[in-house]
Amino acid sequence: MARESHFSSKKARVFVRAIRGDYSLKEELARLRSMPRIVKGRELLFNDGPQAFSKHFIEPADGMTQTLHIHLEEYAPGGRTQKHGHVNEAAFYILDGEGYEIHDGIRYDWKAGDVAIVHMNCVHQHFNAATKPARALVLKSKPMIMFMNLLFQKTVIPRPTEPTPEGKGFAPRHLEENLNHPD
């Protein structure tokens, strides 16, 4: 008799691992209170590219929060991100532009004002379907996932290394007075 797959099994499970470590609430509160309370977005630069750029305001490595990872994504006209999957959930608030996501092979269209939700363990990719840039503010629970030692992230298709034809010469809007894309 073959063993039942853990992937499709409905067997009862406990999904919490024991979390151990030296921890002083007093010391942790003092450390958190010593961290900056304002992140100057204008002092941060976009990285990655040439089709998808990221500006990280709060990252797990900063230690500024225990539960949040917040970054801004800007997609060049016709641009796309890497295809990847990760354990942590993510919410993309679409600031401007229009595009779509592919989540586990299913397409979801979005435009400014929408929120795109990426569920845990979903293989996904983000696409800008327009000839203008698109921008999204991204909120993730990545630090909490890392704390619980549940982090898993895998790239399926890497980021493009060449710009799209319509995105040649594109640079993210870093220091514009009006961060909304003019019509």
Feature map (PLM): residue ranges:
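Short acidic-glycine-tyrosine-enriched beta hairpin
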Residues: G105-N121
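Glycine- and acidic-residue-biased ligand/ion/polar-headgroup-sensing regions
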Residues: P77, N88-G99, D104
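Conserved short histidine dyad/triad with adjacent acidic residue
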Residues: S54-I58, I70-G85
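A short hydrophobic beta-strand segment most commonly corresponding to one strand
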Residues: T67-I70, A91-Y93, I117, K132-L150
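A short, N-terminal "cap"/entry segment at the start of jelly-roll beta-barrel domains
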Residues: M1-Q66, F152-D183
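Short beta-strand His + acidic residue motifs that chelate non-heme Fe in jelly-roll/DSBH
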Residues: T81-H84, E101-I102, V118, H124-T131, ...
